[in-house]
Amino acid sequence: MTTVTTSFVSFSPALMIFQKKSRRSSPNFRNRSTSLPIVSATLSHIEEAATTTNLIRQTNSISESLRNISLADLDPGTAKLAIGILGPALSAFGFLFILRIVMSWYPKLPVDKFPYVLAYAPTEPILVQTRKVIPPLAGVDVTPVVWFGLVSFLSEILVGPQGLLVLVSQQQVN
């Protein structure tokens, strides 16, 4: 089987046997056939595979290599350290964004005075950039809500009970 790959997408003539027959009687004008070629995405350049078994072995070795690469740089000790830093940081920013949501209800608050500046100063540089992308809707600033959602999502995905860093930190070292 000959496979031609171009920038991570391979066009394989051998895959044409798995394709359904076209209901149209007129041929496809691009390749003069009655059916379209099947495109399969791959992560490697495969010169020639004599059998499908070789192709399956190559694909399995690629997926195993990608799995090993993604977990190679992060050992359980580093994951525990990252949890210790990211967990409180994400919780603190989540709380600050909740305060900013409440502060957005009162636009005349003196944000440069003591109690309000604690929530205003760390979050405003992030919110200014986000306001350029998401303008206020009907006079209501929605950017603190967007950032609270993003911070909550990251917290759950990374350091939640089934988070990625928690799972890596519980991994047994061989």
From Swiss-Prot:
Residues 1-39 form a transit peptide. GO terms for biological process: cytochrome b6f complex assembly. The lineage of its organism: Eukaryota, Viridiplantae, Streptophyta, Embryophyta, Tracheophyta. Residues 100-147 are stromal. Keywords: Chloroplast, Membrane, Plastid, Thylakoid, Transit peptide, Transmembrane, Transmembrane helix. Pfam families: YGGT (PF02325). Signal peptide: none annotated. One of its GO terms (cellular component) is chloroplast. The chain crosses the membrane at residues 79-99, 148-168. It is found in: Plastid, Chloroplast thylakoid membrane. Belongs to the YggT family. Residues 40-78, 169-174 are lumenal. The keyword Disulfide bond does not apply. It comes from the Eukaryota. This is Protein COFACTOR ASSEMBLY OF COMPLEX C SUBUNIT B CCB3, chloroplastic. It comes from Arabidopsis thaliana (Mouse-ear cress). InterPro entries: CCB3/YggT. The gene is CCB3. The keyword Protease does not apply. It is a multi-pass membrane protein.
